[in-house]
UniProtKB/Swiss-Prot annotation:
One of its GO terms (biological process) is response to red or far red light. Its main location: membrane. This is Abscisic acid 8'-hydroxylase 3. Belongs to the cytochrome P450 family. Pfam families: p450 (PF00067). Pathway: Plant hormone degradation; abscisic acid degradation. CDD domains: CYP90-like. It comes from the Eukaryota.
């Protein structure tokens, strides 16, 4: 009787496993019958990487879209990819079915920034980190930072007065200093120069070949990364020795009841500073170019900022409420984010076979939502090549304007970025004037699209 029962149990289990295999086989069979999106894969191994990076990448994307539509396949950077360029497809990948597409970066980037950083994860760990970051960067948390940001802005502008400067490089210093004060609070002043030195070494190695041999940029970057982790370990140790309430990002991480490890805290601090600096610096660089190229817009922005200045006493600081009296300035920021589209695309990876609009996106393939194609679609934004802040007098339709990404992986620091841009623009337009030095056309492409040579300008105080 016992043997008979065992036999029946094992038989049922075997039958159940066979049924599962049959269902899985049917699903695989049905999914493999789906066609891949149209497109070309280029040469073996290299794919179409050369075609992508030997020209303006956006020309490559636009040509593909014209030929194949809003969903197409290609092969770049050693990976088969599906590129998508419609608001509906972007929403599908980033919002509706985001659980089917995980964030993905080259392994060398993960090693450099830290494998526990928020960018590389999804699920519960990502949700937990995102809440902690938002707690430090939401309006209620950053409103008291206005005087500190204003001090950094004024100090920066004073140092540029009467000089010719590389806009992008100087804006990186400004945004780096703002990032430090928002992430480390008062502690940053003791470590600023060491942190800055390490970050510039890290930056030089970020896009280098991942060859970890003495003398290579990657090796130097990894050494700098190790030193950064040690600096942060020292800051953590000192805070624990003298516990007090901190409203900065490090304080948010340290107060987490579930408890982050020191390695997790270090990885996320290093990653957030890296992300906060370059993207915002790129936006500021483009704003100065667009305002210089559009004197009527510059005049209107200056008038708006002068009205705020006239309502204040001599030497009186800006307030959070003042930054909410800048509607035109905010539209200039929005239009810059659309026109320049600092992040042309983002990377995701299909975690299983996915069907979209009758096409198969195979498991393991990279999926790239093309933000720039959406932002420059004439059916969405009329005359997309024109810099026109007035287009944002009416809110854009959902999923058509995604400068900070979309969904659960959208940038949690966008409010801080808008604040530090607004504060700098206030003092820049009311107290200074600038002109572009050398050719004003041309774009250079790297991690971000930038005006040629980082936009050299001459800046001087107004009489």
């Amino acid at each position: 009787m016992d043997f008979s029962g065992l036999f029946l149990t094992l038989s049922a289990a075997a039958l159940f496993l066979c049924l599962l295999r049959f269902i899985a086989g049917v699903r695989r069979s049905s999914s493999t019958k789906l066609p891949l999106p149209p497109g070309t894969m280029g040469y073996p191994y290299v794919g179409e990487t050369f075609q992508l990076y030997s020209q303006d990448p956006n020309v490559f994307f636009a040509a593909k879209q014209r030929r194949y539509g809003s969903v197409f396949k290609t092969h770049v950077l050693g990976c088969p990819c599906v590129m998508i360029s419609s608001p509906e497809a972007a929403k599908f990948v980033l919002v509706t079915k985001s659980h089917l597409f995980k964030p993905t970066f080259p392994a060398s980037k993960e090693r450099m920034l830290g494998k526990q950083a928020i960018f590389f994860h999804q699920g519960d760990y990502h949700s937990k980190l995102r809440k902690l970051v938002l707690r430090a960067f939401m309006p209620d948390a950053i409103r008291n930072m206005v005087p500190h940001i204003e001090s950094i802005a004024q100090e920066s502008l004073n140092s540029w007065d009467g000089t010719q400067l590389n806009t992008y490089q100087e804006m990186k210093t400004y945004t780096f200093n703002v990032a430090l004060i928002s992430i480390l609070g008062k502690d940053e002043v003791y470590y600023r120069e060491d942190l800055k030195r390490c970050y510039y070494i890290l930056e030089k190695g970020y896009n280098s070949m991942p060859i970890n041999l003495p003398g290579t940029l990657f090796h130097k970057a990894m050494k700098a990364r190790k030193e950064l982790a040690q600096i942060l370990a020292n800051i953590l140790s000192k805070r624990r020795q003298n516990p007090s309430s901190h409203t900065d990002l490090l304080g948010s991480f340290m107060e987490d009841k579930a408890g982050l490890t020191d390695e997790q805290i270090a990885d996320n601090i290093i990653g957030v500073i890296f992300a906060a600096r370059d993207t915002t610096a790129s936006v500021l660089t483009w704003i100065l170019k667009y305002l210089a190229d559009n004197p009527t817009v510059l005049e209107a922005v200056t008038e708006e900022q002068m009205a705020i200045r006239k309502d204040k006493k001599e030497g009186e600081s800006l307030t959070w409420e003042d930054t909410k009296k800048m509607p035109l300035t905010y539209r200039v920021i929005q239009e810059t984010l659309r026109a320049a589209t600092i992040l042309s695309f983002t990377f995701r990876e299909a975690v299983e076979d996915v069907e979209y609009e009758g096409y198969l996106i195979p498991k393991g393939w990279k999926v790239l939502p093309l933000f720039r194609n959406i932002h420059h679609n004439a059916d969405i934004f009329s005359d997309p090549g024109k810099f026109d802040p007035s287009r944002f007098e009416v809110a854009p339709k959902p999923n058509t304007f995604m400068p900070f990404g979309s969904g659960i992986h959208s940038c949690p620091g966008n409010e801080l970025a808008k604040l530090e841009i607004s504060v700098l623009i206030h003092h820049l337009t009311t107290k200074y004037r600038w002109s572009i030095v050398g050719p004003s056309d041309g774009i250079q492409y790297g991690p971000f699209a930038l005006p040629q040579n980082g936009l050299p300008i001459a800046l001087e105080r107004k009489p």
